[in-house]
Amino acid sequence: MRSNSIIMSNINDERKINERYKMMTEQPVRRLILKMAVPTIISMLVTTIYNMVDSFYVGHLSTEAVAGVGVSFAYMAFINACGFFFGHGSGNYISRALGAKQGQNAGRMAATGFFSPLILGAIAGLICMIFISPLSRAMGATDSILPYANDYLRFILIATPFMMSSLTLNNQLRLQGNARFGMIGIASGAILNIILDPIFIFGLDMGVSGASLATAVSQCFGWSVLLWGTSRPGNVHIKFKNFTPSLYYYKEITRGGLPSLARQALSVVATISLNRMAVHYALPGNEASTVAAFTIVSRITMFCFAIVIGFGQGFQPVCGYNYGAKLYARVKESYMFCITITTAFLIVLGTVVYIFAPDMISWFRGEDPELIRVGSQALRWQCVAFPLMGMCTATNMLFQNIGYTWQATLLSMCRQGLYFLPAVFIMSWLWGITGLEAAQAVADICTFLTSLPFAIWIYRLLTAKSQHNV
């Protein structure tokens, strides 16, 4: 009986995988992307909303508390770097393998991509717990900010393996074309976090530690939901026996995940550099206010880009499946559709945020005028370059998804690294805090100018391939 049920389960899985293949390669591209994008947009929005609510509650404690959480962003960016590296690296391979109908390879990659960050996260969390105070200072904590940074980091360090592998699971599910389970996992954790935040922070009087514990518990819960999602029919199941830590699979993970690793690793350096320069160029006595201002701006811009990233993530599985199936005309059509929609959205959003920037900043910490002043100016500078990011995001995702590693890595390094880091140091040296406020906008403009020739080149290449394939 058991063998019969296993056979029936395998037949059901194969049928669902074949149905998804047909949907991904035959359904009209625009409708398909919208269908794929809705759950990823929802999960991105819910995640960024809980991040904003987290900062809102912490903002009711003190400016130093907000700054302490902001300093901890560098470690969170490290978790993201590793999670997205394994998630995008394994997920991109899985989508191409499914497009080429190589199910066994997809299963091995899924297991390897999941267990690797779980192990790495446990090691990283343990080492960082031992050196927690030096870590906080290295990330930019001053004497007044240090206690809050340490309090926030402790529970995050414990949850590191689950947070890291959770990102991997979400991206694997999404790139298989089943973002719904990813959305359920991410959204359930985020909603739980929103509920637990006020209970732990104020009800149990845990302060910043309460915000950290709420995040850790919620992330672990979301992880368990995502892991359950991989066992559902039609998804590539994760089995320890398929864990294959071989050079081939890690090479493929690196091929697909290096752009994400480069982008997120530079985000760590960028966050630390921004915190340090904010402390250095802040008005005397306003160091915590200045760091907190940039922390809040980061939360708001994350929310603004959530829909763009979510829409792009809906584009990625469509791109991966059809590129694997050699349907290049569909890849090109989906790419141009993604650019058009995201650019139009960012024009409207940038205008609205520019107008209401002071109100948005004061919502987090309305009783700190210096925080509102610095935050409003920095946010308005970023709005100027918002419309340029649609093309940059879509182009980077396309290169990463189809395995053009060095192009994707170069483009992913531009915004937070190649241009932002020099802008932070040079512009703050020339114009102080005003230069620091404008640094991200300048980096975004330079990133657009760099991405444009790559976008033209890949468009022409896809056109040639589609004509050759006819």
Residue ranges of predicted features:
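Helix-terminus/linker motif at the lipid-water interface of multi-pass membrane proteins
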Residues: 45, 49-67, 136-143, 199-206, ...
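Small-residue hotspots at the loop-to-helix junctions and early N-terminal turns
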Residues: 63-74, 149, 153, 212, ...
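Small-residue-rich hydrophobic transmembrane alpha-helices
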Residues: 66-126, 163-182, 291-357, 389-411
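Residue-level signal for short hydrophobic patches within transmembrane helices
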Residues: 26, 30-49, 53, 75-82, ...
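Short runs within selected transmembrane alpha-helices of multi-pass transporters and secretion channels
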Residues: 87, 156-174, 182-190, 211-224, ...
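Hydrophobic transmembrane alpha-helices of multi-pass small-molecule transporters
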Residues: 78-81, 193-197, 223-227, 303, ...
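Transmembrane helical elements of multi-pass membrane transporters/channels
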Residues: 35-54, 155, 166, 189, ...
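Short alpha-helical transmembrane segments in multi-pass integral membrane proteins
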Residues: 1-37, 94-161, 203-258, 319-385, ...
